[in-house]
Amino acid sequence: MIRRLHDTNDLVRAFPRVHFVGIGGTGMSGIAEVMLTLGYEVSGSDNADNVATRRLASLGARIMRGHSAANVLGTDCVVVSSAIREDNPELMEARSQRIPIMPRAAMLAELMRFRRGIAVAGTHGKTTTTSLTAAVLSEGGLDPTFVIGGQLLAAGANAKLGGGQWLVAEADESDGSFLRLNPLMSIITNIDADHLENYGNDFARVQAAFAEFLQRLPFYGLAVLCIDDPEVAALAAKTPRHVMSYGMSPQADVRAENVVQEGSRMRFTLRLPQGTSQEVVLALPGKHNVLNALAAAAVGWQLGVAPDAIARALEGFAGVGRRFNDLGEVTTASGAKVRIIDDYGHHPSELEAVFAAARGGWADKRLVVAFQPHRYSRTRDQFDKFAAVLSSVDALVLSEVYPAGEEPIAGADSHALARAIRARGRSEPVVVGKAAELASVLPDVLQDGDLLLMMGAGDIGAVATHIAVEGFKGEGEA
């Protein structure tokens, strides 16, 4: 029977059961939560249990541990993460049963059909910028839907179905899937060399993908672009779409002036179009976060959010999971008190920005970094940049590379990176195996009053949380 579909209610009635393969991932779990709230019967499978799967289960989703062909029986649609292999038994069964299979980004695009989409793209800063934009629109009374690649701490979730007409979401350039989206507004924070393995190791293809991303805007759409980034500025100069620029550059339409860091906060004057200005205190450290806030302010101003409401949102922002999260002070067995910061940063540019923020807010402290490189291919491609930026800290402990499914690459492991750093003659890094070993090794490196940054996109975040709760182990302890 042919069914006439007019809105999301019709879709839920016609195709009520949706199954997510790899539901525990940040992007997947957010979409699943929105679809649950819309009224879909959501199920999902994952090899690991985590905060996201437990939250979804508490909201009514049916969560299966591991992958089995039986998991997809009776479902109307299967949504798949880009991390899932083609020979996954659930995908194979869905194909044999002719069940529609949708990549994660394609399902996000479907959700955007029923909202006005704001897509946040860029190599770095997407999660924080998406979160700040959602916060600004919420403070302005627009009640947006949002899907974020990290937990918005104020909401306790990475997604929410709002009652307003706008949907704010991250647009993932890593595999080119952001080209599936059709937003009305697009933000680009920066363009850097990352995930080159998905672009034939050709940065020109990355640049072309971002240009195409803007081309997907309708003629009446808006590109919100950071012109402090040279690559984005070059794109802004030639895109055939309406542009609102932001940055600290005097030429930016929305800009920050008089920028000062005060500990973990930034103070600046927000300059908006038409001569409007607003004093702002941002509840995040670092100039990179000022840029993220400017993107959110630009969108807010464009949608009619009052400048004082923008300022309230930025000052009251509670942060995002694993983005310069202050986990508090921990004492080693020898009595050294250290403050732990947990951060997702895993690219040299991200490390550099976080180090600058740490030094700007805690200039009197020794900067100790525990870093878990993420992917052998990234370590290889960014090897010299990693060596340069990691050489700048006061003390460094490296865990082995988190492979994320990759096979080891000769000369692209943590031991090779440590040798390159030693050759620069500025520091003597310590190398451990698994990130879990950091808890026993770090006390030998730390001194009283240190600021400890624990960074990486792998399982080092769980180690940081464990240390913050349980303390350091290994100084004569089991």
From Swiss-Prot:
The keyword Lipoprotein does not apply. It catalyses: UDP-N-acetyl-alpha-D-muramate + L-alanine + ATP = UDP-N-acetyl-alpha-D-muramoyl-L-alanine + ADP + phosphate + H(+). InterPro entries: Mur-like_cat_sf (IPR036565), Mur_ligase_C (IPR004101), Mur_ligase_C_dom_sf (IPR036615), Mur_ligase_cen (IPR013221), Mur_ligase_N (IPR000713), MurCDEF_pg_biosynth (IPR050061), UDP-N-AcMur_Ala_ligase_MurC (IPR005758). Gene3D superfamilies: Mur ligase, C-terminal domain, Mur-like, catalytic domain, NAD(P)-binding Rossmann-like Domain. Pathway: Cell wall biogenesis; peptidoglycan biosynthesis. The keyword 4Fe-4S does not apply. Signal peptide: none annotated. It comes from the Bacteria. It is found in: Cytoplasm. GO terms for molecular function: ATP binding; UDP-N-acetylmuramate-L-alanine ligase activity. GO terms for cellular component: cytoplasm. Its EC number is 6.3.2.8. ATP binds at G122, T123, H124, G125, K126, T127, T128. GO terms for biological process: cell division; cell wall organization; peptidoglycan biosynthetic process; regulation of cell shape. Keywords: ATP-binding, Cell cycle, Cell division, Cell shape, Cell wall biogenesis/degradation, Cytoplasm, Ligase, Nucleotide-binding, Peptidoglycan synthesis. PANTHER family: UDP-N-ACETYLMURAMATE--L-ALANINE LIGASE, UDP-N-ACETYLMURAMATE--L-ALANINE LIGASE-RELATED. Cell wall formation. HAMAP family: MurC. Belongs to the MurCDEF family. This is UDP-N-acetylmuramate--L-alanine ligase. It comes from Stenotrophomonas maltophilia (strain R551-3).
